[in-house]
Amino acid sequence: MAHSIWHEKIKSFLPEHYYGRINHFLDEAYASGLVYPPRENVFKALQVTPLEETKVLILGQDPYHGPKQAQGLSFSVPEEISAPPSLINILKELADDIGPRDHHDLSTWASQGVLLLNACLTVPAGQANGHAGLIWEPFTDAVIKVLNEKDSPVVFILWGAYARKKKAFITNPKHHIIESSHPSPLSSYRGFFGSKPFSRTNAILEKEGMTGVDWLK
């Protein structure tokens, strides 16, 4: 992970030498088989959205496990890749909430202060949750704890039971939580559709005197 403010803040919430354990895990994982995303993109979310600019967190579970899908940003895929089912539903809700967006690559959200973080940062090809419980959760929980310490408000968007459990780390009353069921086809009709997370996020940011996100960009 590139040295940054993120690096130092996250480190303070982890056991000693945990970064070394992560690097060892990555060396072994990428040497032993096909793993997504490409190794250079494992920490992309933290590289493209600096801590000081982060005002929204959208928490995913783990990267897409199909060829060329995962790019290090939760729910996002490269522009030339077909949208997976969860992203299709996210874009459908966005269209109903604010307006249509044709792009599958969510990098422009990340560049506006939306941290697109997965709880697990790697996945073996074809094995959803294949790296769950091995190394990543203490690290990404630490990211949430770092955000919780921010003096400026952050909107935490938590979709699904797994993400909603992370509310335990969000104790600072300055922050806001938007939660619903997950956008996956299995649960999207149980509260995700119609939840209007994008307009609600912007309403919160603007009420706090901050610039809203151009979700259609």
From Swiss-Prot:
Main subcellular location of this protein, as a coarse class: cytoplasm
Positions of transmembrane segments: none
Record: active site: D62 (proton acceptor)
EC class: hydrolase
Record field: catalytic activity: Hydrolyzes single-stranded DNA or mismatched double-stranded DNA and polynucleotides, releasing free uracil
Keyword rRNA-binding carried by entry: no
EC number, as in UniProt: 3.2.2.27
Entry's Gene Ontology BP terms: base-excision repair, AP site formation via deaminated base removal
CC annotations in GO: cytoplasm
PROSITE patterns per UniProt: U_DNA_GLYCOSYLASE (PS00130)
Disulphide bridges: none
Sorted UniProt keywords: Cytoplasm, DNA damage, DNA repair, Hydrolase
GO terms for MF: uracil DNA N-glycosylase activity
One Pfam family it belongs to: UDG
Location(s) in or outside the cell: Cytoplasm
InterPro entries in the cross-refs: UDG_fam1, Ura-DNA_Glyclase_AS, Uracil-DNA_glycosylase-like, Uracil-DNA_glycosylase-like_sf
Function, in words: Excises uracil residues from the DNA which can arise as a result of misincorporation of dUMP residues by DNA polymerase or due to deamination of cytosine.
Record family assignment: Belongs to the uracil-DNA glycosylase (UDG) superfamily. UNG family.
Record-linked HAMAP family: UDG
NCBIfam families given in the database record: PRK05254.1-1, PRK05254.1-2, PRK05254.1-5, ung
Protein's UniProt name: Uracil-DNA glycosylase
Lineage: Bacteria, Bacillati, Bacillota, Bacilli, Lactobacillales
